[in-house]
Amino acid sequence: VCSSCHGLSFIAFRNLAESGGPGYSVAQAAAFASEYKVKDGPNDAGDMFERPGRPADYFPSPFPNEQAARAANGGALPPDLSLITKARSYPRGFPMFIVDLCTQFQEQGPNYVSGLLQGYEENPPAGFTLPEGSYYNKYFPGHAIKMPNPLSDGQVTYDDGSPATVAQYAKD
């Protein structure tokens, strides 16, 4: 769902099989990579060419450049999601930062992203003026976000029987 607009420019296919990743085998990561076409070269004739992806390749961007991304998204540039959870950490204040040190809690970024994806509301509260081309999100700073709600229940089916809900998608 997210990959239609957002890139993962700092994530290689091999990362899918590393510890801390989603738990794919090396063979699964290689098979996933091979489904993508990657520009390579030049060959002996000096021409660039496309080849199947390899585990060492990075995920290709959904757009050829920033201008194309902005044109497809109403002037907004979708952020790269490679490091989004590290970039969206937030201070928890006293005494929670002490608790976080003791418990090794480091999930502020993932919690922010999950909240953002679940924070869309069809109608803003009374008195709130939503700029044209924006969507109301109760967790986004300022509450006006250019990204439309990307998730809806039943959109993705899980092989393991996990619930097909916005809450589950946002967590994943």
Name each region found by the language model.
Residues C2-S9:
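The canonical Cys-X-X-Cys-His
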